[in-house]
Design a protein with these regions (language model features):
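Glycan-recognition and catalytic cores of secretory/periplasmic carbohydrate-active enzymes
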Residues: 24-548
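Sec-dependent signal peptide recognition
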Residues: 2-12
Length: 549
């Protein structure tokens, strides 16, 4: 269907190109062609995400109106660490972009019900049973409550917060975090609650990431102090570079990312604490590079750093999550080995890692679970945002089609909470193909694609039916929402592509003459009003103009 649509508009591109050459400076037909192709890819991404959202909404419990963790053995449970962390938030983000009625209606009501029904210790959530109409576990398990809260915040509410900003979901995130702060001393004894050390490291890694970001967002010193308390243990009190079990895939790699985020924060604040941490952090990262990778530069699932041995030699689908840490430390210290580590996997992606079994689950087929593909592709997109390598781009464009092929006609992917990761990565991919812009209101018959080239960005909006609305550009969300001085790579962030600077001036050229002119960034932030007739195509070229003041 999408290829047919592309071919249908190739002739239109040529006609449009001949027309717009008279109006645009040095326009390239290949860029317009790529922007239109990107529009088709983006629309497929968005359509699939909305199909996922509607399918899971159909599984809501009739009384609580919450979604289950999966459609099999946990059909009667809402779990903060699963339903809340993985599925629900990306239903919300899908609706925010594509269906505002759904966003302000059913999905907001779900948040209200989640808070009312699942809060167990203050605002801290616990597993809720639809059949019991109360908590699944009669006895309170503080360890599992802390785990569920940390997952819900970092994996679910934080990505929403970083994209949307101030909202009821941001409020929920902060109230849970502040109630976790009440139990700060219980974090010192997490190993009493969990058999696997990787679960403790996952929680602490999630907290380091959350606390570093919320510190910048709020300026509240207590969050930074808490993060330092956690990092002191790993980098000053024990030799974590000598740990006997380090998991480098999800549910373990978070600690490496968390330590790097705090390290970046200390660097940006010019605090001496950074240099106290530096030797231990370098030892950890250097040993991961030496003993934790295969010949292609991909990380093993788990390693023993005390014995310098590989425990699980399967390749981690979250390869980019760990590389985020290396890139972040490279940003602070310009340590060349860490940048080389980020670049190395690009060389073998297309030869050895297409149709790769990232997360083996034989009952699902030879490619395993879609969750592995979702994480692996997210890994690539976030790195591509920083290192725009053509080999990486080719691999992402290839493997997203493998991922898309795993969705059922119903909209369900595999029927468990990991389905949300499909939508997360699909949205991430689609927003790359629109350079972060979106249309409001969205409708299936109107597509937007974009491509950036040097200092210019081309947007092509193609309407099959009459449409009236706005073209909305992305903002520098790391600044406007998180107040971050640097946009370092973060797990589960939605990368920024073309972003407005509200203090800059932009020139717009277009085949719609009424749009041509100069605009202040603060005015463009409100969007560009558009009205398109059926079968009309609008091209908009946006370029930042020099500040002559």
């Amino acid at each position: 269907m999408y290829k047919i649509f592309i071919y249908k508009y190739i002739s239109l591109i040529i006609i449009l190109f001949n027309f717009t050459c008279k109006k645009f400076d040095l326009i390239e037909s290949s860029l317009l062609e790529e922007a239109i192709v990107n529009g088709n890819l983006a629309q497929e991404s968005f359509t699939r995400s909305l199909s996922f959202t509607n399918a899971w909404l159909g599984l809501r419990d009739s009384e609580s109106e919450l979604i289950p963790s999966n459609i099999n053995n946990k059909i009667n449970l809402w779990e903060p660490a699963n339903s809340g962390a993985d599925n629900y938030p990306f239903m919300v983000l899908t609706a925010y972009l594509l269906d505002k009625d759904l966003y302000h209606g059913v999905l907001l009501e779900m948040l209200i019900n989640e808070k009312k029904l699942t809060s167990r210790i203050g605002s801290l959530p616990d597993v809720y049973s639809f059949t019991k109409n109360t908590f699944e576990n009669e006895n309170l398990d503080l360890g599992n409550i802390i785990f569920g809260a940390s997952e819900y915040i970092k994996d679910g509410l934080m990505p929403l917060n970083e994209f949307i900003g101030a909202s009821p979901w941001q409020d929920r995130m902060i109230e849970i975090l502040d109630d976790l702060y009440i139990h700060i001393n219980d974090f010192d004894s997490l190993d009493e609650y969990f058999i696997k050390s990787s679960q403790v490291e996952e929680i602490n890694g999630e907290m380091l990431q959350t606390l570093s970001r919320v510190y910048w967002m709020t300026g509240d010193q207590k969050y930074l102090d808490w993060a330092i308390k956690i990092a002191d243990y790993y980098l000053l009190e024990v030799d974590f570079s000598n740990v006997e079990y380090l998991k480098l895939r999800d549910h373990g790699c978070e600690i490496v990312g968390g330590l790097s985020e705090l390290y970046m924060t200390l660097h940006l604040l010019s605090l001496e604490k950074k240099y106290e941490y530096q030797p231990a952090l370098y030892r950890l990262l250097d040993k991961i590079l030496t003993f934790g990778r295969n010949q292609d530069g991909f990380f093993y699932n788990s390693i023993n750093l005390k014995a310098n041995q590989v425990i699980d030699n399967r390749i981690a689908d979250t390869w980019g999550y760990t590389l985020n840490a290396f890139y972040t430390v490279w940003m602070t210290d310009q340590k060349s080995e860490y940048l080389e580590a980020v670049l190395k996997p690009f060389q073998s992606l297309n030869n050895s890692y297409r149709n790769f079994e990232w997360e083996p689950k034989k009952q699902l087929g030879p490619l395993g679970s879609q969750d592995g593909y979702a994480d692996a592709i997210e890994s690539g997109i976030n790195i591509y945002n920083r290192m725009q390598d053509s080999k990486l781009k080719t691999w992402i464009d290839s493997e997203i089609q493998v991922l898309f092929g795993m969705q059922k006609n119903s909209g369900i992917i595999e029927g468990w909470h990991g389905d949300g990761n499909f939508a997360r990565t699909a949205l991430m991919y689609g927003l790359w193909k629109t350079q972060g812009a979106h249309l409001e209101p969205w409708q299936p018959s109107v597509k937007i694609g974009a491509i950036s080239n040097e200092d210019k960005t081309y947007f092509v909006i193609t309407a099959q039916d009459d449409w009236e609305g706005q073209l909305l550009f992305d903002q520098k969300r790391h600044k406007t929402i998180l107040n971050l001085p640097e946009d370092y790579p973060r797990i589960n962030q939605f990368p920024e592509w073309f972003t407005l600077d509200q203090d800059a001036t932009y020139s717009i050229q277009s085949n719609k003459e009424q749009l041509i002119g100069k605009y202040e960034g603060k005015n463009l932030k409100r969007g560009v009003a558009l009205s398109l007739s059926a079968n009309e195509q609008c091209v908009i070229l946006v370029k930042k103009t020099p500040n002559l003041k």
